[in-house]
């Protein structure tokens, strides 16, 4: 068993032993601990780029020295890294990195990853500065990219070897760098960029926050922040911030400038998500000396709507299940049939329509099935499974045999006939009353007209009898 495997085993035993006596969260205290990671060192292929790597890799270890972590009691018997790999035939290259001048917010996730059943991938490569005055023999820079599986964090760190390392007696034969008495390459983390989540899923129309933070040593200046989107071979700028000026290329994209200086937070907010927002986002932070980035995958989802209808009422009726407004494309449609007193059974023979895509980018499809009602009828269910649904979504309808449909039709027609007769009867009952009221109204109108005519005749007579 190697040193790294033994160290992880001891840590897991310590964590399991302290599980039953885990204190209240309020009682947790900060403690400095060494975080040891199994890595690979990408051999220098002569590429002068920010991240130089090749297919050839060598075994390596990364020891983050005395990282502050919250201790819940499980680190009581924890032992820091002691080295001791020089006696091996093929010892890994050990990088000791101090974190005195930067913050590692997700150190706990790195420390407990093995015991939590998560995998940590770590790759170290040379980092080349585009500047003069650096001495390769005594100064070197490395980039360490660390990722935790299962939705864990991802962190990229720029590490620098100290200038006084030239006084060391031991030298690494391939790196041509001085080694400590323990046989390690001593470095210091001067800049790091991290994200808490490497992949996110949001519903269509909602808002998304893409996490991106950084930490740097005093003396470095923040130059720019850039968010870019890569999707289906195309790249585009989403948001940029340079020396105090922010510009949103994607409508509504926001980044809080005050958070850059105070909290070292470069997170991006995207409101009213559309299908076009899906893809790989790159958060790139540039300082006066270093540049690093994080990659975040944003997935857009839209839940389907399911509607089941009866297309015809033939001897063997056809059922149509409409699935509309879903994204992404993959969807599973199953049909089940259940007779009275029986259990649901999956049926085959369904056909599908051509795929349809809306202007918004969502998909729709229809599934048709010829139903067999049987002698007592049956209930058919169209069930849809999609990544946006926590559980399958279904719609059901009951299909009855032809004789029952005929009987039901007769009952329905008879009911309509009886209702019509009842309505006519009520109309006839109300007819005499309405006729009487109408005649009374006519008599009243005639009487008033006769009275007015009489008065008019008297007035005319009076006018004629007056002397001139």
Curated annotation (Swiss-Prot):
It comes from the Eukaryota. It is a single-pass type I membrane protein. Component of the antigen processing and presentation pathway, which binds to MHC class I coupled with beta2-microglobulin/B2M. Association between TAPBPR and MHC class I occurs in the absence of a functional peptide-loading complex (PLC). Expression seems to slow down and down-regulate MHC class I surface expression. The chain crosses the membrane at residues 406-426. Glycans are attached at residue 265. Residues 181-297 form the Ig-like V-type domain. Residues 427-468 are cytoplasmic. The lineage of its organism: Eukaryota, Metazoa, Chordata, Craniata, Vertebrata. One of its GO terms (cellular component) is plasma membrane. It is found in: Cell membrane; Endoplasmic reticulum membrane; Microsome membrane; Golgi apparatus membrane. GO terms for biological process: immune system process. Interacts with peptide-free HLA-A*02-B2M complexes or those loaded with low affinity peptides, likely facilitating peptide exchange onto higher affinity peptides. Interacts with MR1 in a ligand-independent way; this interaction may stabilize MR1 pool and facilitate ligand loading and dissociation. This is Tapasin-related protein. Residues 1-18 form the signal peptide. Disulfide bonds join 212-283, 321-382. Residues 304-394 form the Ig-like C1-type domain. Keywords: Cell membrane, Disulfide bond, Endoplasmic reticulum, Glycoprotein, Golgi apparatus, Immunity, Immunoglobulin domain, Membrane, Microsome, Repeat, Signal, Transmembrane, Transmembrane helix. Residues 19-405 are lumenal. InterPro entries: Ig-like_dom, Ig-like_dom_sf, Ig-like_fold, Ig/MHC_CS, Ig_C1-set, Ig_sub, Ig_V-set, Immune_Resp_Modulators. The keyword Ribosomal protein does not apply.
């Amino acid at each position: 068993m190697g040193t790294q495997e033994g160290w992880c085993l001891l840590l897991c035993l310590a964590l399991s032993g302290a599980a039953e006596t885990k204190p209240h969260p309020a009682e947790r205290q900060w403690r400095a601990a060494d975080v040891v990671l199994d890595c690979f060192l990408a051999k220098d292929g002569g590429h002068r780029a920010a991240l130089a790597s090749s297919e050839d890799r060598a075994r390596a270890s990364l020891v983050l020295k005395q990282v502050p972590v919250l201790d819940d009691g499980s680190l009581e018997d924890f032992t820091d890294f002691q080295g001791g790999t020089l006696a091996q035939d093929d010892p890994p290259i050990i990088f000791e990195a101090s974190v005195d001048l930067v913050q590692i917010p997700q150190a706990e996730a790195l420390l407990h990853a093995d015991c939590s059943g998560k995998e940590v991938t770590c790759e170290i490569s040379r980092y080349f500065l585009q500047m003069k005055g650096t001495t390769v023999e005594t100064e070197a820079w490395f980039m360490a990219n660390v990722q935790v599986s299962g939705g864990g964090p991802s962190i990229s760190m720029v590490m620098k070897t100290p200038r006084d390392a030239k006084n060391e007696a031991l030298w690494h034969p391939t790196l041509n760098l001085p080694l400590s008495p323990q046989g390690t390459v001593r470095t210091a983390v001067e800049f790091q960029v991290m994200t808490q989540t490497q992949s996110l899923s949001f519903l269509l129309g909602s808002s998304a926050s893409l996490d991106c933070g950084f930490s740097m040593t005093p003396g470095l200046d923040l130059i720019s922040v850039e968010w870019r989107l890569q999707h289906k071979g195309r790249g585009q700028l989403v948001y940029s911030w340079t020396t105090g000026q922010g510009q949103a290329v994607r409508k509504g994209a926001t980044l809080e400038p005050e958070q850059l200086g105070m909290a070292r937070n470069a997170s991006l907010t995207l409101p009213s998500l559309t299908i076009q927002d899906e893809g790989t986002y790159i958060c790139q932070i540039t300082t006066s000396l270093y540049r690093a980035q994080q990659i975040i995958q944003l997935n857009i989802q839209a839940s389907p709507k399911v509607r089941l209808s009866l297309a015809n009422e033939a001897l063997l009726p056809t059922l149509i299940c409409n699935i509309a407004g879903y994204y992404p494309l993959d969807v599973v449609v199953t049909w089940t049939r259940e007779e009275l007193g029986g259990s649901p059974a999956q049926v085959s023979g369904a056909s599908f329509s051509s795929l349809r895509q809306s202007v918004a980018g969502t998909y729709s499809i229809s599934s048709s099935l010829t139903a067999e009602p049987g002698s007592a009828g049956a209930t058919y269910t169209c069930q849809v499974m999609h990544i946006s649904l926590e559980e399958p979504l279904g719609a059901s309808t009951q299909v009855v045999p032809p004789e029952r449909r005929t009987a039901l039709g007769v009952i329905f027609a008879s009911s309509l006939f009886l209702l019509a007769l009842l309505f006519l009867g009520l109309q006839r009952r109300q007819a005499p009353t309405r006729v009487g009221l109408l005649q009374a109204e006519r008599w009243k109108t005639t009487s008033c007209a006769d009275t007015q005519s009489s008065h008019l005749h008297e007035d005319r007579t009076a006018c004629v009898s007056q002397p001139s």
